[in-house]
Curated annotation (Swiss-Prot):
Protein name per UniProt: Uncharacterized RNA methyltransferase TTE1797
KW Ligase (keyword) present: no
Top class in the EC scheme: transferase
Keyword terms, alphabetized: 4Fe-4S, Iron, Iron-sulfur, Metal-binding, Methyltransferase, S-adenosyl-L-methionine, Transferase
Source organism of this protein record: Caldanaerobacter subterraneus subsp. tengcongensis (strain DSM 15242 / JCM 11007 / NBRC 100824 / MB4)
Residues the entry annotates as binding S-adenosyl-L-methionine: Q285, Y314, E335, D380
Positions of [4Fe-4S] cluster binding: C71, C77, C80, C159
Length: 450
């Protein structure tokens, strides 16, 4: 296969990043946007490490699994990958991807508990970051990036994976911006005022938080927009409207200064009967109902922990540790980001938990300073997986159980193999669909000392 060549392939499988995979001349060809069962003409591009990738030029034969997407933005918006597959087929693809990666790493003789459906298939997201910009025709837009494009924005005012209140906030804000003739930020010239609209909702608690992110290139009072929000017929309770100043050139929401225009700068969510304070910038799982399924699985895998010490590694804002603390003797959480540790301590206090301790620092370093020995270690690392030094230290503690929570099937399978090589056995694996209509899947694995 030469770069630029157009070849015809049948998509025979899906990979863990949502690419379709076909075979040409006996070699795999990754196809962005390809669907299992399709026959497509593909223009070859060279991918990383010599692996071939390609883009679809023409769909010659539709997939038998393909359905009409219920979302008018699908195909143009970069938010979803599987809107044109039935939900049952989405689940099957994710399950097959997980099992194939585990098989590749030689993980066997374990109980696979299948993939659990998301409790909500539509309207499940509790946070969205909308971008102010222009569409491919140069018209002003507020929404998500166009698929594969850095500068173009798609006006996603009919998105079906978000709550209706998000769409209402988006429309109100967009129309207000047009009426006031406020300049939208241009990422090419770094000029303009309005950058992002961030909306968060406590799905279980019904609280709504709206954050308008701008540069400092203009001075504008949003009093009338706040009144529009307050008088809007939201199904949620509006608890706060914020104004964040962000002059950074990076394409990310960075808080350089924060003003509370109305109410408070946080909302309260409830999971498994526990309360969590979520600020405008806190990390929190974006599917609250799905998060409960993950944490319930961690509890189930841990078993009776009434006399156990649990280490919660890469603990973030401490959600897993806080969920385990009411049942355990003691929980020790470690997280690199100091702001996240502050939130973890705050949430532990909010729930009256005195047996949960959270430490700021690098996991691989802090593990060597802790004198206590864990009975159970829970790891929920970043997508790259567990740091090799930290993995060695975890094994040296000789915990009776290791519970591995992951958002990346590839690093999950790789790290399970490393734990197996160091004397642990994989007992159970469960997949949980946190993000319907995307390729993402969450995993929980149970390992026990051999």
């Amino acid at each position: 296969m030469a770069k630029g060549e157009i070849v015809t392939v049948k998509i025979e499988e899906m990979d863990f990043k949502g690419y379709g995979v076909g075979y040409c001349e006996g070699k795999p060809l990754k196809v962005r946007g390809g669907i299992l069962g399709q026959r497509v003409a593909v223009r070859v591009k060279k991918g990383k490490k010599g692996r071939a990738e390609g883009e679809i030029v023409e769909v010659i034969e539709r997939s038998p699994f393909e359905v009409e997407s219920p979302c008018p933005h699908f195909g143009e918006c970069g938010g979803c990958t599987y809107q044109n597959l039935s939900y049952e087929n989405q689940l099957k693809i994710k399950k097959d991807v997980v099992l194939k990666l585990l098989e590749k790493e030689g993980i066997k003789d374990f109980e696979f508990l299948g993939i659990e459906r998301s409790p909500k298939v539509y309207g499940y997201r509790n946070k969205m970051e909308y971008t102010f910009g222009t569409d491919r025709e140069g018209k002003k837009a507020l929404g998500l990036h166009r698929k594969g494009k850095f500068y173009d924005v798609v006006m996603t005012d009919k998105c079906n994976i978000v709550d209706e209140d998000f769409t209402k906030a988006l429309s109100l804000t967009f129309n207000y911006a047009l009426e006031k003739n406020l300049p939208f930020y241009d990422k090419k010239t770094h000029e303009g005022y309005l950058r992002y609209l961030v909306v968060r909702k406590a799905s279980k608690n019904g609280e709504l938080l709206i954050n308008i992110v701008t540069t400092t290139q203009l001075k504008h009072k949003f009093d009338d927009l706040v009144e529009l929000y307050r008088s809007a017929n939201f199904s949620s309770t509006l608890v706060g409207v914020l104004h964040t100043y962000n002059d950074s050139w990076s394409d990310a929401v960075i808080c350089e200064k924060l003003e509370v225009l109305y109410g408070r700068d946080y909302l309260i969510e409830e999971l498994l009967g526990l309360k969590f304070k979520i600020s405008a910038f806190s990390f929190f799982q974006t599917n609250s109902y799905g998060a409960e399924r993950i944490y319930s699985t961690v509890r189930e895998f841990a078993g009776d922990v009434s006399n156990k010490t649990i280490f919660d590694l890469y603990c973030g804002t401490g959600t897993i540790g806080i969920v385990m603390a009411p049942l355990a003797r003691k929980v020790i959480g470690i997280e690199l980001v100091e702001e996240a540790v502050f939130s973890a301590k705050e949430n532990a206090a909010l729930n009256g938990l005195e047996n949960a301790v959270f430490i700021a620092g690098d996991v691989s370093k802090k593990l060597r300073e802790i004198k206590e020995k864990p009975d159970i270690v829970v790891v929920d690392p970043p997508r790259s997986g567990v740091n090799p030094k930290a993995l060695e230290d975890i094994v040296n503690f000789e915990p009776e159980k290791i519970i591995y929570v992951s958002c990346n099937p590839e690093s999950f399978a790789r790290d399970l193999r490393l734990f197996v090589d160091k004397g642990y056995a994989v007992k159970k694996v469960k997949a949980i669909d946190m993000f319907p209509h995307t390729y993402h899947v969450e995993l929980v694995g149970l390992l026990e000392k051999s």
